[in-house]
Amino acid sequence: DAAEILAKESVQAVIDLENMGLPFNRTPEGKIDQRRFGGHTRDHGKAPVRRSCYAADRTGHMILQTLYQNCVKLGIEFYNEFYVLDLVMTKVDGQERPSAVVAYELATGELHVFQGKSIIFATGGFGKIFKTTSNAHTLTGDGVGIIWRKGLPLEDMEFYQFHPTGLAGLGILLSEAARGEGGILRNASGERFMERYAPTIKDLAPRDMVARAMANEVREGRGAGPNKDYVLLDLTHLPPEVIDEKLPDITEFARTYLGVEPYTEPVPVFPTAHYAMGGIPTNVQAEVLRDNDTVVPGLYAAGECACVSVHGANRLGTNSLLDINVFGKRAGVAAVEYAKTAKHVPVPANAAEEV
């Protein structure tokens, strides 16, 4: 059901973002452009397809900016630098119900209690449990941990995706857009090694396949560099104007962090911890599940911290952005509808002291 909903509501999700002002790349005819991405194929892997709508190589960043601008436009209040420490659960009619969250104000060190009829967890992933990750320093799994400490279940936590192209030694992400635009992965001898692992779709094979292939090349001694511990992302055959227009972040990152000029040099890359498939189990309305059949009234989760099970053990590139927009919207709509008729659950007087 969740996968069907994701597919059916995907077009409207893109239209919604366009209507909010997201600057998608365009075709010469003025339509939203689409590019190839890893694992996006037709006829069960027979050929790659252009499926991914994009804004240069910073689509996620542009979604963030677009949504934030619309929040400002609508006068939505943000409590910046407030760090949520705990979810307050209150027993009502013999059942634990969410009533508030306790947050730590970084500027003052004070604890604050925020009561809510509906509470949505959109706390992201937990990539910082790994040594090398594309994730920000703040993504340490706090939201998922809060839910676990409340005795609620987690789902599919063993499924974690490693993105093939992190800057070698740093983990900073180089978008799959580079390979979507024709970038080639090569080993130390210059061989396009993905032709051996995925002869049909080569460098645009699913991420798990590409990451394993890269690790195997290094393990068998075909890695590049003085320690033979990475492979090379080659963009040198692409026209500079294509790189500048469609891959600006990739070129900036390579120059800034590695001192490599992508016009003339291949970029050292190696897999980096990237995305959690598992998290807080929800139904298709983003309601948090207490078990397979029971929801926690008034509690929702969306985005990387949630697990509605659309991705399985390894998601396709760009499907995370689609997931957060489709099910993030569903979470918001469901939370509003619940709050219209629900009453506030009482908050214990010592809620902050119990953290």
Protein language model features and the residues they cover:
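Dinucleotide-binding Rossmann-like beta1-alpha1 core, especially the glycine-rich loop
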Residues: 1-24
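Short beta-strand to alpha-helix junction loop
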Residues: 2-8, 50-69, 79, 133-141, ...
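Conserved redox-cofactor binding core of oxidoreductases
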Residues: 18-110, 115, 122, 163-170
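Conserved mixed alpha/beta core segments that line enzyme active sites in large multi-domain catalysts
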Residues: 69, 77-129, 158-160, 249-250, ...
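Short FAD-binding loop at a beta-strand-to-alpha-helix junction that anchors the flavin cofactor
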Residues: 118-124, 285-287, 291-316
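Glycine-rich loop(s) and the adjacent beta-strand/alpha-helix scaffold that form part
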Residues: 118-172, 317-334
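An anion/pyrophosphate-binding glycine-rich loop and adjacent beta-alpha core
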Residues: 146, 152-268, 334-340
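Long, amphipathic alpha-helical stalk/connector segments used for oligomerization, subunit docking
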Residues: 337-355
